[in-house]
Amino acid sequence: MKAPDLIILDPQDTVAVALTDMAAGETRQGVRALEPIARGHKIARVAMAKGAAVVKYGQMMGVASTDIAAGAHVHSHNCAMPEGHAEMSTVSSAALQAPARQSFMGYARPDGRAGTRNFIGIMASVNCSSTVCDAIAAEANRTLLPKYPNIDGFAPIVHDQGCGMANQGEGFDALVRTLKGYRDHANFGGVLIIGLGCEVNQLTLYKPTDWANERFKTFNIQEVGGSRSAVRRALELLEPIAAKANEDKRTEQPVSKLVLGMQCGGSDGFSGITANPALGVASDLLVAAGGTSILSETPEIFGAEHLLIARADEATGQKIRDMIDWWRDYAGKNGASLDNNPSPGNKKGGLTTILEKSLGAVAKGGLSPLAGAFAYAEKLDRTGFVYMDSPGYDPVAATGQVASGANLIAFTTGRGSCFGAKPAPSIKLASNSELARSMHEDIDIDCGVVVGEGVPLAEMGARIYDLLLDIASGQKTASEEFGYGDNEFVPWKIGAVL
């Protein structure tokens, strides 16, 4: 199939996207370029007067800040955020046929969930115990892991919080939810939590739940004689935990036990054309098979939230509106604006406004009905396509999704990302083939073939779905092969540091 050289995403669009560099005077699909148009950037299909809507994906993505001639380059020099965004149209929810493949090889857990990995977590309750947790994990990986080959590793879960904060309120609650979500995560075959002893975030908050005591232990460094003594004590406790976790074996599990966290970072002009909508297809397939997918990054859906609200019941829709209102207030109090989200890298890649970025970001959610909206790191209580509130900062958002129960992460990128998490494997999807080639060490699948080779989005989405099940069954991701995940646990820090 011949690849297109200019793409029009919706018949209503007043702009098209150049799929390769376009020279001044060159004509494609009836549009003659008045100036050079870089690959991934937008060209005006029609003339637009100052103040007119600039339309992409069939939605307003901005307004002309000056008169724009047909064939002109449309970007931040002549396109700006509107005073308010218009809801020009909405997608309708679709009921997709369930895919043929509906199982994976995972670890059955006592509470009915299934893990895609079998790590042992070494968790810090406070930053003061983080270095000790790192030392424990390193020593356990050196001395214990060779004896217990059915364990994926000892993962340090360390952070910079846990003290110097109030013991109540949004920030404290978010931290406790996050740590409890990791404590109970299906990808952990056992957990050891280490405190210092005098911190605000006390170990008494983290009682064992469904894990028997043989799988879950805690202690404070101050109570065992110091740092080196803590490492020795931890290894004593970890030996029986590791022996028990080593008995865990992969067995066939239904896709309904998969929970996919969806992320995008380093987006470019192709992200909303290739990787994001293709991931949306995979999300729909997962949901149709009974699984769960999580969309997040509230600042990055700003301007496109109506597309989610249209797919939700009244209560869920109101939760989304409340989240947007909270973020407007939060950003304003901290001298920021949701309107200013696109990063320099986003803009270099062809994204102009937060509305344009948001419309592409929401495409990751496919067309399935929105089944619920959850607070950051809140435990999910249903399957289907759901929304979890979070910042747009990738490691913070992914940390919350994993705490909510995600046992897989799918991460789309156009400029390039090296992200990887533990204990949930992270699949990297490139929006363009150039990135897939240049950063092949970090990319798991090339979605650029949608434009480069004319591969239909439905087929690309099916490929992603199959890869998700392969990864869930034990195939290593690029980030796992390199060893990412020890420094990517980043709970959302809300409020004052005292």
Predicted feature residues:
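Short secondary-structure boundary segments
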Residues: 413
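Metallocofactor- and cofactor-centric catalytic cores in central/energy metabolism, strongly enriched
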Residues: 1-408, 417-498
